[in-house]
Amino acid sequence: MAQTYKVAVELSTEATLQLFKLEGYVIALTRTLDNVYRIAINNFPIEGELDYYVHCTGWNKTTWSLKISLDDKDITPDPIRGVIEKGYSAVRGSIKF
C-alpha cells in the first residue's frame, strides 16, 4: 500500500512547460511572475520511489531545473536540469528516497 506525502514541486525556466507527470499522473503547475512553475499537493500516494516526467518547449539553449520536496524536505538528488535543443526538452526519471 502506498504511503502518502505532502509533495512540493518547483520548475524554474523561461521555457514553456508542456507536460509534467508524477507517478504517471498529469499534474498542472502554476506559473508565477518569477518564471517558476509551482504546486503543492497534500496526501499524494507514493510507493518506494517517485517517478517524474518533464516536457518543455522554447528557444534553443533555454535551461530548466526541477526541485521536488516531500514533507518539506528536498529529495532532489543532484540538480535535475535540462536544456532545450531542437525546440524541446523531455526528461524522465525516478528518485529513490
How would you name each of these model-derived features?
Residues 1-21, 36, 43-97:
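Beta-strand-rich recognition domains
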